[in-house]
Amino acid sequence: MKFNVTLAKGIYMKRIFLIGSAFIGIIVGAGFASGQEILQYFTSFGTLGILAGIVSTVLFAYVGMMLVWLGSIFKAEGHNDVIHKLTGGTMFGKVIAWLVDIVLIIALFGFGVVMLAGGGSNFEQQFGIPAVYGTALMVILVLVFGMLRVDNVVKVIGNITPLLIICIVIVAIYCLFTMSGSFSELDTLAKSHTSAVPHWFIAGVNYVSLNVGLGASMSIVMGGNEKNSKIAAWGGLVGGIVLGLMIMISHLAIFSKIETVGHLPLPMLGLVNDISPILGVFMSIVIYLMIFNTCLGMFYSLATRFTEIETKQFKIFYTIFTLIGFAISFAGFTDLMTFFYPVIGYMGIIIIIVLIYAPFKVRRIKKQGKSLQDL
């Protein structure tokens, strides 16, 4: 009997770990890997970036827990299922669903454009090749593989995420142990860089709502596949906490070398190059593949929002969205991130408000003796 209890706990822990890892994989993308997100949202506030990181950690923990938990208790297949059941199909619910849909559409396009520009910045920073060539190659790859629907390629590249996380942690530890200069000196240098938003607290909130805008639907679907809502909730909670810790580790790494990498479009790549140019080339390729993976996912999802997959209309929409993104990408990776990310983040607060309201609504539904699945 004791063995069975231990075995059950082991199985539960494994499922919690898998859900947590999947949540991290949904949120962590090429923007995080580049380090530019961390620089603008956290490091640019100097030592106060730690406080912003704590705010993000708390919010990511709550948001991760709620998204996966809601998916589980409602057996949801998408975010609209949850919104419909929470609002009872009222006009208010339809308005909220429409607003969330708008947020997701803008987020998909905005992220796609920023990532196209990021592909060019990657080439320029690492190899000295003009950014336009790196971006043009990215556009060609996105168009070709998007038309072929080579899912296996995307899955393989998606598996790079755990390796990337390990690399970031190792790089961060190295940077902290080799840090030169006092915290006060580094703080002054860090604060001289452009911030995405005006205050560290807003940065912590905006960064979470920015990422939730893209990760909400997938996280809910993931929760819908977990029968045990407690395991789902713990998995989302653990994933959110680990994600927050990764943010703070990355922030401290960039902060410790701000004089060396603060001016670079991809600070994390600069940190790796500082350790070894050979590792820098490897990291550059990994980031480029992650950018490709993100771009493909963004424009593919955007096109499927308006058309059916594998139709002539899909190919037309997909091509048009990608080419428009290519044209806008000439504004530059850093400038585009500074513009698009805060806007998407402010809009994404709508989703966080829904998640704060959700547990109270669920409790009320249960008190009325209604089945959550039959709503």
Indicate where each model-derived feature is located:
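Hydrophobic, membrane-embedded alpha-helices of multi-pass small-molecule transporters
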Residues: 14-33, 52, 104-108, 112, ...
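Transmembrane-helix boundary/entry motifs in multi-pass membrane transporters
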Residues: 14-15, 44-50, 73-107, 125-131, ...
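Transmembrane alpha-helical segments of multi-pass small-molecule transport proteins
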Residues: 16-26, 53-58, 98-106, 125-149, ...
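Hydrophobic alpha-helical segments and their helix-loop junctions in multi-pass secondary transporters
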Residues: 30, 105, 131, 142, ...
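Small-residue-rich segments of transmembrane alpha-helices in multi-pass membrane proteins
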Residues: 52-53, 85-100, 161-176, 239-249, ...
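Juxtamembrane transmembrane-helix boundary signature
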Residues: 55-81, 249, 253-257
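Membrane-interface loop-to-helix entry segments
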Residues: 118-121, 130-138, 145-176, 337-355
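Membrane-interface interhelical connector segments
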Residues: 192-193, 254-277
